[in-house]
From Swiss-Prot:
This is Phosphatidylglycerol--prolipoprotein diacylglyceryl transferase. It comes from Thermus thermophilus (strain ATCC BAA-163 / DSM 7039 / HB27). It holds the Pfam family LGT. Its EC number is 2.5.1.145. GO terms for biological process: lipoprotein biosynthetic process. InterPro entries: Lgt.
Length: 283
């Protein structure tokens, strides 16, 4: 709609950055409370979480750039402008998890308890990011559709380029001169719903917690499934495996995220089984 929350002279404070910052701080506090309730020392977590956030953001942006390379090859500096939106949450999870793993191997910090405790914060980040995408307008653009749920952007809405029908290359979206007036799938809202579902599920997994690592791998599993089913088919993303496309309904299969999600689902199932067996053998 309007990416700028507040304009103070030349300084523009954007919704995307404000919402993500709030999600990070709230997620951090939720993680601290969870670890304290489990009896873990908070000092090591507080030392590593800053770097986990930094490399989570780096991984998120890198993942987005690598899966939508056309535009960024021609405009490489745009890859640095994360306030314009465009973050891969698979990349964020990978970047953050690798940071925790590094400190686990290097300094002996706990791995699975930290990753488990961080899951509500990641879910909040998904919700915040998608609302920020909605305000940006140009992020996570939905496909044109004739379905009743199609949304037509109002004339006063700002912050988005046009979308041409039938495009599968995201770089073409940026080039299109037409204004986006829909009706389109409002995939920003679809993605926010995915984040809300994961937030409630992550809180349930943390309470259940049959073993450390359970909440984290359940999160990876269900994020991959829910994103692939509820959001990706309706987004105007390049089809890496063009198995199905319906321009009338606004559905396309399969995007890069959907392709990557399958091995992540299998890995999650394997790790849940492995960690569960390890816990059972210690009893």
């Amino acid at each position: 709609m309007d990416p700028v929350m507040v304009q103070i002279g030349p300084l523009a404070i954007r919704w995307y950055g404000v919402l993500l910052t709030l999600a990070i701080f709230l997620g951090y506090e939720l993680a601290r409370r969870r670890l304290r309730a489990w009896g873990w020392d908070l000092e090591p977590f507080e030392r590593v979480v800053f770097w986990a956030v930094v490399f989570g953001v780096v991984g998120a942006r890198l993942g987005y750039v690598l899966t939508s390379p056309g535009y960024f090859l021609e405009n490489p500096l745009e890859a640095l402008y994360i306030w314009h939106g465009g973050l891969s949450f698979h990349g964020a999870i990978l970047g953050g998890a690798l940071t925790f793993y590094y400190f686990h191997r290097r300094r002996g910090y706990p791995l699975w308890p930290y990753l488990d405790a961080a899951t509500p914060g990641v879910a909040l980040g998904i919700v915040a990011g998608r609302i920020g995408n909605l305000m940006n307008g140009s992020d996570t653009v939905g496909r044109l559709t004739t379905l009743p749920i199609g949304f037509t952007w109002p004339e006063w809405a700002r912050g988005f380029p046009g979308v041409c029908p039938g495009i599968d290359d995201i770089s073409e979206v940026y080039r299109c001169a037409e204004l986006l007036r829909g009706p389109v799938h409002l995939t920003q809202v679809y993605g926010a719903v995915v984040g809300l579902i994961l937030l409630f599920l992550s809180l349930y997994w943390l309470r259940k917690r049959p073993f450390y690592g359970y909440a984290f791998w359940q999160f990876v599993l269900w994020y991959s499934v829910l994103r692939s089913v509820l959001e990706e088919p309706f987004r105007l993303n390049p089809l890496w495996l063009p198995v199905y496309r319906n321009d009338e309904l606004g559905i396309g299969l399969f995007t890069a995220t959907q392709v990557v999600s399958l091995p992540l689902v299998l890995l999650s199932l394997y790790m849940l089984r492995r960690l569960g067996k390890g816990e059972a053998s210690r009893r």
